[in-house]
Amino acid sequence: MIDIKQGIITLCESEFQITADTTPQALTAAIPALISQVHPVSTGYTHYNCWLDIEPQCYLWASVCFHGDALESIRLFPQHQSATAPAPRPDPMDTESSHLLGHAWYGKFFEQDELSFPRGSIRYVQGRDPIYSPTCVLIRYTSK
């Protein structure tokens, strides 16, 4: 479930809440089995590719990005869904199909293409390329 007024994502099975104050340590402790890959970057960012069960019995592919210990952003890829947390990563999908699936999922929850909350914003991003710039729902967080 996403509480857009507060910018909180509550996972269904674990009931773990991802907030602007979530740290990498808290994420890895709460959902270790759902994290498929961790990519540290030389600029201080670390990307956690994982499956998040935002809806009951529906896992979405996501990339959770931290800069140091600060949560920077979450990219949700609703075009990649599964009833169980499946393989290490989803297969690429053509741009048009991913746009249609992503926009339909976003429209179920949000009425506007961009919304803000006290410490960030959420918006729908129509992708241009299935690998380097895929369709996603982008949640950005700001520091205190």
Q: Where are the regions that the model predicts?
A:
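Short helix/turn-capping signatures at newly exposed starts of structured segments
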Residues: M1-K144
